[in-house]
């Protein structure tokens, strides 16, 4: 392992399992056959400490410029001076450090130690070890989630810790909200999507509004689609959650991804009266006539006989430009459950707007045949 910080440059090699003294001035134990090598390149002449374990005993060696020096006060002072920075920067011995601190000071003590760490890699190791050691419930893990959101800046390391929590702790709605809040400053669409997927797959009680709020931070239409489709597939969404998710779909940039989300939504829930307005607003946000047709054809299959849905669909069709796609949508509604008498004027108006005589004739002919049945 190599790292540098404020002019300090170190090479560190660890073999085996290591524990340090509580004050981080020395190595307390090292698994048999293990070794720790620290080489400081910060000065013109490098200094090296080698600690080895054999037959239950530790041996220490000190080198300056490659030449062996006695293990004296200078050597011990060098180790004691550099070890705190080394341990807190690299995360060496994280599991044993967390165990020792947790046994003496509890969760608060470990969180205080995490505040002293010098990087997100080390923080990740400590957070993961704490979660494994403490065996939190949903309420108990909230301070940890808050500290993750406050202290971690690396999206990758933060996501790794959050996923570990989701896999170890059964989160209730409040805990899931704290989890999502811990993601608030993440910028990587991939890491946000992965963290949300793991949360939903874990069986946590996730509020749909919270998911929709998190989705608003995701710029990638692909990543947003994956999250929204997973949220839709979970079922048991409140009306308000459905409205929020549909608003999230409307804000997507890709017509393909938006169409995929709306199609999944229709297949799962249909178009219920309380969400009709946000649903069709999302459909109208689709610029591609082909993608609109895909969604509205699915609507026709699911709720094609509903008068209000027919009228909203025909209004949307009238704003499209492709005669073929418009005709196919109108035919899908005719084939589904027929056209409601109250919706017939809107249907005929949409058909008459077709510039293609061929498409107009086949749509109106289908209407006449359906009415004769």
State each model region's role.
Residues 1-373:
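Non-catalytic all-alpha helical scaffold/repeat segments
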